[in-house]
């Protein structure tokens, strides 16, 4: 159990898009101390990419790399370059929580390497490989975490957007079955220009194509909203925007509902994680959002044919900052256990 009154010591493994934004977000948390980052890239490069961000702008703090550390204003953060997490000095530095954001150590075996190194808990910034690892979306099912849980998955950015809508519809109307599509900003797991990739669609130039591909969000939703297990499938359309995405969810419901009833149920569920929006927005309007999911009430619609109804709802998310803020909420929750 982590002491409730003490400052929580955090390390970040993997200083890519998510790792750097987690760093920015955690730095402003009064009860969190970022002790170290681990990445195989040279500290000078890490410092530059932390300071300058094409999607989220310049970091308004002084950032300097010096002697295997990052100096953020006057705060020193250690920088390690270790391939094997088991060899990291987490015990020596009394690390309470590791944010595992490499995308590589997402299995129980891989994440446990941080525990072997002396960390008290690991939060994976991706879907976990095993269902034995609890998958949580803050303000949907995060209260399933208990003090004994050593490895936790904060799910994916898309699952964090989808889950609140599924939770509300399942709770209020019951979902029979459905499908979802995320229109998703391109990511580093695509090719900038046409080049080999195991997914032949992701092999095509990301910045000039609409790229149909897979998403695990529809299948993973059952880990967060158990009542929806097996009821959804889905796919992704990767599009040429830097960040900012939207989920379309199309379902058949057990109970009849109107647009107004659906919107009212979503509005009632609004929270710091789930924003209810009545404005006619576009993707650039939600870049930098701290909400994990932004419900677009103007897009709710119903189609009825021969008494059979299909319901469509939509939610926006910044696939970077929306997710990072949800992950930080999970970190803070774990810090209080």
Curated annotation (Swiss-Prot):
Enzyme Commission designation: 1.2.1.12
Database matches in SUPFAM superfamilies: Glyceraldehyde-3-phosphate dehydrogenase-like, C-terminal domain (SSF55347), NAD(P)-binding Rossmann-fold domains (SSF51735)
Broad enzyme group: oxidoreductase
InterPro entries documented for this protein: GlycerAld/Erythrose_P_DH, GlycerAld_3-P_DH_AS, GlycerAld_3-P_DH_cat, GlycerAld_3-P_DH_NAD(P)-bd, Glyceraldehyde-3-P_DH_1, NAD(P)-bd_dom_sf
Active site: 157 (nucleophile)
Positions of the record's site feature: Activates thiol group during catalysis: 184
Keywords recorded for this protein, A-Z: Cytoplasm, Glycolysis, NAD, Nucleotide-binding, Oxidoreductase
Pfam families: Gp_dh_C, Gp_dh_N
Gene3D superfamilies on file: Dihydrodipicolinate Reductase, domain 2, NAD(P)-binding Rossmann-like Domain
Residues that, per the record, bind D-glyceraldehyde 3-phosphate: 156-158, 187, 202, 215-216, 238
Listed GO MF terms: glyceraldehyde-3-phosphate dehydrogenase (NAD+) (phosphorylating) activity; NAD binding; NADP binding
CDD domains, A to Z: GAPDH_I_C, GAPDH_I_N
Function: Catalyzes the oxidative phosphorylation of glyceraldehyde 3-phosphate (G3P) to 1,3-bisphosphoglycerate (BPG) using the cofactor NAD. The first reaction step involves the formation of a hemiacetal intermediate between G3P and a cysteine residue, and this hemiacetal intermediate is then oxidized to a thioester, with concomitant reduction of NAD to NADH. The reduced NADH is then exchanged with the second NAD, and the thioester is attacked by a nucleophilic inorganic phosphate to produce BPG.
NCBIfam families, sorted: GAPDH-I
Family of this protein: Belongs to the glyceraldehyde-3-phosphate dehydrogenase family.
Name of the featured protein: Glyceraldehyde-3-phosphate dehydrogenase
Name of the gene: gapA
